């Protein structure tokens, strides 16, 4: 098997190792399923992620889509709580880092995303934390959002 293939088992091991006991096992499974769905999706919509998950697991598409929808509407799963595990995981072996803070406008939907990236030696950037905000709420608040990230 190609070592770069992201399987349910491999993603589950990674996510479980990252969040440890801070997230219920069923939530770890839901996050794992969503990650595998995203990696195998053609776009990032609930339907496409569910279809990607169904393709990998053999589930019926409607059931996989429902799983993704339930995860995203579950208020007990906090993105910021997951970031608290993601960032130390990515930075664990690093003694010194260079980061970039970037705003990206999405004119079509009236949103902006601010992201903090780890700049790597090979010229790419790994996203550490990000947040999307409505452009209409940016005025005089850009620095506040940057501080939050």
List each model region and its residues.
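Conserved, well-structured functional cores that handle cations and Mg-NTP chemistry
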Residues: 1-149
